[in-house]
């Protein structure tokens, strides 16, 4: 027996696009999610039981996508000021917990680091806030001369997100903000270094279009051409 379902969805198109499926076929199951005029889900399967399982999985993903969408509507990204020092320090230590090789553990050095980032390129230093609460920072230095590229690049010295807000698009929004700033400054290359043991971060950057380059003393250089 074949079961066919056509379901019109009342979801924002942005959410639909994040879930879009184009002609998925596997083990007698066909799924299409089209986001053109009205989001519509098409499912063909062999039984009511498998249809229920597919719908359960789909709505679980839809709810997660809606959560991200609603969060994105509430966040703002602005330039960092000197008044953000305490929030930076608190979030910095929280975000790097478990990655002892990759951050300044003493508060005095973390404070110096914040001031150094401000001095390098204040206009490229951003904080993301959700309902007024800082949840992530990115520092993009467009005055940096890369020793390897032999030219000025947009160097992302730092990016971190509150662990409680990871997986919700905040990191992507911060990287996109840095890239937007880099383009404004006329840079064609965005460069960053990430610890070779930080596999999650490496995969995150790769999904955003960064390419793996050389490894130097335990740090992997990654590059995105814009």
Curated annotation (Swiss-Prot):
Residue stretches making up the N-acetyltransferase domain: 75-226
Keyword Nucleotidyltransferase: no
Keywords, ordered alphabetically: Acyltransferase, Transferase
Cysteine pairings via disulfide bonds: none
Family named by the database record: Belongs to the acetyltransferase family.
Class of this enzyme: transferase
EC number from the UniProt entry: 2.3.1.-
InterPro entries from the UniProt entry: Acyl_CoA_acyltransferase, Bact_Acetyltransf, GNAT_dom
Source species, domain of life: Archaea
Example GO molecular function: acyltransferase activity, transferring groups other than amino-acyl groups
Protein name: Uncharacterized N-acetyltransferase MJ1207
């Amino acid at each position: 027996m074949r079961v066919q379902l056509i379901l019109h969805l009342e979801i924002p198109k942005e959410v639909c696009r994040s879930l879009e499926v184009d002609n998925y076929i596997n083990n007698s199951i066909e799924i299409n999610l089209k986001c053109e005029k009205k989001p519509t889900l098409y499912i063909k399967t062999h039984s009511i039981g498998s249809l229920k399982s597919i719908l359960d999985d789909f709505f679980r993903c839809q709810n997660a996508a809606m959560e991200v969408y609603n969060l994105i509507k509430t966040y703002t990204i602005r330039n960092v000021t000197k008044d953000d020092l305490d929030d930076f320090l608190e979030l910095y230590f929280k975000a790097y917990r478990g990655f002892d090789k990759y951050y300044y553990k003493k508060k005095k050095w973390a404070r110096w680091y914040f001031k150094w980032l401000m001095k390098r390129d204040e206009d490229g230093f951003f904080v993301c806030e959700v309902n007024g609460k800082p949840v992530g920072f990115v520092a993009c230095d467009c005055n940096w001369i890369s020793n390897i590229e032999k030219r000025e690049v947009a160097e992302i010295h730092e990016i971190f997100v509150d662990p409680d807000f990871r997986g919700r698009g905040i990191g992507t929004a911060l990287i996109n903000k840095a890239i937007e700033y880099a383009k404004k400054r006329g840079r064609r290359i965005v460069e960053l270094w990430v610890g070779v043991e930080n596999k999650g971060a490496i995969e995150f950057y790769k999904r955003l279009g960064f390419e793996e380059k050389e490894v130097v003393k335990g740090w992997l250089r990654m590059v995105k051409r814009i």
